[in-house]
């Protein structure tokens, strides 16, 4: 899980979602998981 100021899709399978007011990227590739913080 990467925590960064700007989250971007790293591949075409990445999905940008909002959870509890946080922007997150979920992806089958665990390296692409990100959270805005």
Swiss-Prot record:
GO MF term set: structural constituent of ribosome
Covalent S-S links between cysteines: none
BP terms from Gene Ontology: translation
Pfam families: Ribosomal_L36
Xref: SUPFAM superfamilies: Ribosomal protein L36
Coiled-coil ranges from the UniProt annotation: none
Keyword terms: Ribonucleoprotein, Ribosomal protein
PROSITE patterns according to UniProt: RIBOSOMAL_L36
Keyword Ligase: no
Any one GO cellular component localisation term in the record: cytoplasm
Similarity field: Belongs to the bacterial ribosomal protein bL36 family.
Name of the protein in its database record: Large ribosomal subunit protein bL36
Organism of derivation: Synechococcus sp. (strain CC9311)
Name of the gene: rpmJ
């Amino acid at each position: 899980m990467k925590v960064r100021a700007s989250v971007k899709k790293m591949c075409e399978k990445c999905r940008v979602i909002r959870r509890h007011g946080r922007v997150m990227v979920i992806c089958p590739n665990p390296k692409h998981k990100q959270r805005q913080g």
